[in-house]
């Protein structure tokens, strides 16, 4: 069935490779970010990540350490309408579940006079784990369209051949051609895991009483695994009918064998591939302080990151499917660059040591960060983020804060795929801090993200020649707690 094979080759390649790319930004490293969002003008320990130049203005000489633990859950769903789906409204809901139950991060800084040396370890990117246990619409739609189109063409070819045309009068043959989705089962599952571990080291120097600078770097290590399978099996009634027809009409046996192989399968793909890679991100920053104002900026250079396959399983039956797994052969490298990033923040302390607020802007140059199959070129622009937050010290013991973030990814239909899709969003975070003593602070925060549904329609849905529509939706919830130490 050449058309089915061609469709599945393209579908499997697109779907599997999309798991290896995508927008992997992760800025919620410290609980202070969760509860305020805009931390780009911070002069506390979380500034190691958000505003490293600002560490020169910390209020404590000596060591400051911070340990943070977060727990995140996401849903990533696709509501798909396609003409060949057997449901009454031809619509199916495909649910994806992503989780990162424990997200740790560790901060450290040592300040002495005008110098501050700092370090950070955490998950700086990646989407955690995501499971599509009920499969994906791109698989189901493409397989259904391929099987229907191929068997419809077979019926037409038989009708034009006087030697076999009478066979079409047999109800068993007439009921089999063309094959509709109620005659076979598609069993598919996709699972992915992506984590980018970051280890950052750097130094801050106070040039003037109102100005400091930072230089450092972050070592990034990518760890991922992508596994999935697609199995197409005839229903028992169809399998029995195929056998009966083959016995009744031996001349049709070779043709029928293209529908169902000797193992009773119509298709079988199985993949288990781990990927690793690393790259170094140079980082510079500056912080200016004047009469209650703080103006800070940070720039992270683009990181070239190539990830290499360690493939344990790559089964494709029939053999024509092997090309679909070419990108996942053992030892193959795939680009997955981290984009250059620019942060700018303006903070103001309305009441000294009491009430402060910050507005902030982030830009991720995603269009120039190479992804698998040049996927970045499909973006309309890089990612823009605007943040704002306010923090109030109720007294010397208790602090409360809240903040918002709006994210615009510059998405396009060509960029989105079922396993790697993004949705523009806004986030709201809130929480507080408790000074357990002069040298120990407890932070607690919670934030949720509201995503805008993304609709895409195609007249030629993933090469099926039939129209289809997807609505992508996501949810995100994160809770965390952390503790800061000074000594």
Model-derived features with residue positions:
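Repeated loop/turn-to-beta-strand initiation elements of outer-membrane beta-barrel proteins
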Residues: 114-117, 210-213, 292-295, 353-357, ...
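Detector for outer-membrane/organellar transmembrane beta-barrel domains
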Residues: 285-289, 293-308, 331-410
């Amino acid at each position: 069935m050449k058309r089915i094979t061609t469709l599945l080759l393209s579908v499997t390649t697109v779907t599997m490779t999309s798991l290896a790319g995508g927008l992997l930004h992760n800025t919620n490293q410290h609980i202070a970010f969760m509860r305020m969002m805009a931390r780009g003008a911070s002069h506390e320990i979380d500034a190691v990540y958000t505003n490293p130049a600002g560490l020169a203005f910390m209020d404590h000489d000596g060591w400051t350490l911070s340990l943070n633990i977060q727990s995140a859950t996401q849903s990533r769903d696709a509501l798909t309408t396609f003409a060949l789906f057997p449901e009454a409204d031809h619509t199916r809901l495909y649910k994806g579940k992503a989780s990162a139950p424990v997200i740790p991060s560790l901060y450290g800084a040592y300040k002495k006079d005008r110098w501050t040396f700092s370090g950070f370890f955490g998950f700086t990117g990646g989407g955690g784990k995501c499971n599509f246990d009920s499969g994906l619409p791109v698989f189901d739609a493409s397989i259904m369209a391929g099987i229907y189109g191929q068997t419809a063409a077979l019926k037409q070819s038989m009708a034009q051949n006087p030697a076999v045309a009478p066979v079409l009068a047999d109800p068993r043959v007439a009921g089999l051609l063309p094959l509709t989705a109620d005659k076979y089962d598609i069993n598919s599952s996709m699972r992915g895991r992506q984590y980018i571990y970051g280890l950052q080291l750097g130094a801050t120097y106070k040039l003037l009483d109102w100005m400091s600078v930072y230089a450092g770097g972050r070592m990034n290590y990518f760890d991922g695994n992508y596994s999935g399978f697609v199995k197409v099996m005839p229903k028992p009634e169809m399998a029995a009918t195929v056998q009966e027809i083959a016995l009744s009409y031996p001349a049709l046996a070779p043709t029928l064998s293209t529908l169902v192989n000797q193992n009773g399968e119509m298709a079988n793909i199985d993949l288990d591939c781990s990927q690793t890679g690393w790259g170094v991100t140079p980082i510079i920053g500056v912080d200016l302080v004047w009469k209650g104002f703080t103006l800070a900026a940070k720039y992270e250079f683009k990181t070239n990151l190539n990830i290499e396959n360690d493939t344990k399983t790559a089964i494709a039956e029939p053999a024509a499917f092997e090309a679909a797994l070419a990108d996942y052969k053992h030892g193959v490298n795939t680009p997955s660059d981290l984009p250059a990033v620019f942060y700018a923040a303006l903070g103001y302390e309305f009441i000294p040591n009491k009430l402060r607020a910050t507005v902030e802007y982030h830009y991720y140059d995603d269009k120039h960060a190479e992804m698998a199959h040049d996927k970045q070129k499909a973006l309309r622009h890089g990612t823009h983020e605007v943040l704002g937050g306010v923090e109030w010290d109720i007294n010397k013991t208790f602090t409360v804060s809240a903040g918002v973030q709006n994210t615009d990814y510059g998405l396009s239909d060509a960029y989105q795929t079922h396993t790697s899709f993004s949705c523009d969003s806004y986030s709201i975070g809130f929480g507080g801090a408790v000074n357990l003593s002069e040298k120990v602070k407890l932070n607690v925060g919670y934030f949720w993200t509201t995503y805008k549904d993304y609709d895409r329609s195609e007249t030629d849905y993933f090469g099926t020649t039939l129209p289809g529509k997807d609505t992508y939706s996501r949810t995100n919830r994160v809770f965390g707690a952390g503790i800061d130490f000074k000594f």
